[in-house]
Amino acid sequence: MPLKKLVLSSLSLLFLNQCTKEDELALPSCIEQKIEALKKEAVWNPPAKIYRYNYQNQYVYFFPQRCCDIPSELYTENCNLLCLPDGGLTGEGDGKCTDFFKTRTEPLLVWEDTRKE
């Protein structure tokens, strides 16, 4: 009986260990570079966030707008700017991906600036 408990305890620890913060999503290096650049800027209000979505059968990275007339940005995994989904002077972005908010799937917050102002 003690062996069974030992095995179960070991398996439990193994599974718990698999869910640590160290095993977070591996981001493309160009997205990591954009995060490092954001960390060098003053804290945005609201704080900067980056989301990953599946859009048109590819993973894309969405940088929400930080204020009124500043457009949000949508990048491919290679950091090619796909479009500006919203924001800007009209609030409707650049018009290149008008279906983004309706057709995106698999939302995942991949980074949030947690620095204090």
Per-range role (PLM):
Residues 27-52:
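N-terminal secretory signal peptides
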Residues 20-22:
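Bacterial signal peptide processing site
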Residues 15-18:
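C-terminal motif of bacterial Sec signal peptides marking the signal peptidase cleavage site
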Residues 51-67:
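Exposed beta-strand-loop-beta-strand "reactive/processing" segments of non-cytosolic proteins
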Residues 87-117:
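C-terminal partner/receptor-binding element of secreted or periplasmic proteins
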Residues 69-72:
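Structural motif
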Residues 2-9:
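Sec-dependent signal peptide recognition
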